[in-house]
Amino acid sequence: MFVGSPSAIEKPLSLSSKTKVGDETEFTEDALRGSSLVPTGILNGDDECHALHMSPQAIHSQAGKAESDGLPTYASVEKSTTPIGRLLSNLNGGLASAPPKVGFGFPRYYALRIEDLPRDLTPREFLCTFLFATNVVSVELNPVSVDNEVAHGLAVFSSRDAAASARDTLLSSDVYSACSMIILDNYRKGSQTNLSDETEGSESSVSFNRLSRNHSPTRPLLGNRDLFRRSSNHVSASMPTANHSESAYRHSKTPLGDSTFQAPNNGGSLHSDRLWSSFPVSYPLTLANVLAKDEVGSPTWSPTPSKSSTNLRQDGVPPILRFNSLSINTNVARNYLSSEKGYSAHTQNSSAQSPHPRVFSANSAFSTTSPPPLTPSTSRDYPFSASTISPSTPFSAYSSSHGIHQRIPASTPTNTNPADQNPPCNTIYVGNLPPSTSEEELKVLFSTQVGYKRLCFRTKGNGPMCFVEFENIPYAMEALKNLQGVCLSSSIKGGIRLSFSKNPLGVRSSSSSHNNHNGNVRNLHSGSMNNYNTDSLLNHTGGHNEVHASPSWGNNLMYGK
């Protein structure tokens, strides 16, 4: 801003011009009177108007810089103690205190444009490519879309040497060797990159902060997830094992092969250290943890996998398995002790290692997990009341020649009581049968299974009971797996429950009939059914034994009596 009128001064000083000013230019009192910016009344008196003059030394020095940079210059105003001098100093404001060099240019950046990228490359993977590069300002990826037939990326550097070094390194890899790379000098878009603490984590453009060689960054990256909170002294203690890292690296489905990045080995060294040798290793974060999306689950995610999460991934057993011992009377988990050291201990271990255990959810609804592989530990389930069935329970149709039966996948909890676990045999006990069950319907259902031999059905006061015999044990195991949880046409309290019988059909156990009867009565009070013998249903002559306790699943609570 300058003071003066074009009518009073022949050649006014233009701020946007590059014209040099002479040795000394003074604004006289007559010139100031013609100015529309300064009232004429303030000039009356003995004010020393000649105190305001241009500084030739400052002008010459600034004019020389303006010619070299192509930028406008400003003249400084000498301070004065007179009223007009103070007024003009205020009017000129920042011009008197302007720095010698005033520029409107941006810092120079160099962009590495990479074309013909893999079509399935994600912004996260493209960013991790330059994770250990130096002088990186921003990384952008334009994936394949309707407008872009070929994916291309852009990495902005603050120096050309860093861009050239990154280009040479990428061309030597197997993934980027087929890509075309161009270095763009004086990249102006780099001035608009986000260098503040708030970075944008979008899928099309990912910007991250400048990586320093002397400190570990703690700013948010990729959707405000704090990935670099831990210092470098936690590398050895928090580094996951080689097997776990390689597994997470494979699950990330990254197209970046082993030539670019590898999971850390037991020694904790990274192959990327050789790739970007100029960047110091000050991050405990491994590439496998960055790319494994299941690892980043919360904003406060830590790159160190917890012991519990590692065990869950290795064993595949969720903590909800403890609900398997729910009681039908109290709905409270009861502790059980194994009194058998032989087969029961083996079945407990096999139950703990089952990758898809049949669980009973805490909200009394059915779980939708797939049925587990057939093991003795999952062959018998606890009963449940009708109130535990959710109205929105998904059912799957099971077709047969007789009609369509509904099947509940993983609908019943696993019974882990050692007293209810019988070894596999060729006879299956059918439990949870409604009072109006038809023998013909059961025959039609089980006759569809391979190896079906015969069926023994008996109706007692507490409900029907049924045993199905197959040609051999494998056929019985296959039928148990296929028909477990199938709903009959008259089912009201869930599907049928299948389990192995204590002894084959028609074969009497070594114990006497009286002892078996007493044991069956005790099992009724404990809610167990697997200890019922088929010899109590059939005598030696093949007829039914009249002295027999009903093999219902519990007591009168089963049918609401």
UniProtKB/Swiss-Prot annotation:
Its main location: cytoplasm. It comes from the Eukaryota. Residues 192-259, 295-316, 344-424 are annotated as: Disordered. GO terms for cellular component: cytoplasm. PANTHER family: U1 SMALL NUCLEAR RIBONUCLEOPROTEIN A/U2 SMALL NUCLEAR RIBONUCLEOPROTEIN B. InterPro entries: Nucleotide-bd_a/b_plait_sf, RBD_domain_sf, RRM_dom. Residues 298-310, 390-401 have a biased composition (Low complexity). Residues 192-217, 233-246, 345-354, 409-424 have a biased composition (Polar residues). Coiled coil: none annotated. Residues 426-503 form the RRM domain. GO terms for biological process: mRNA processing. GO terms for molecular function: mRNA binding. Acts as a negative regulator of cell wall and septum deposition. It is found in: Cytoplasm. Gene3D superfamilies: 3.30.70.330. The modification Phosphothreonine is found at residues 193, 218. This is Cell wall integrity protein scw1. Pfam families: RRM_1. The modification Phosphoserine is found at residues 191, 196, 216, 231, 298, 302, 325, 370. Keywords: Cytoplasm, Phosphoprotein, RNA-binding. SMART domains: RRM.
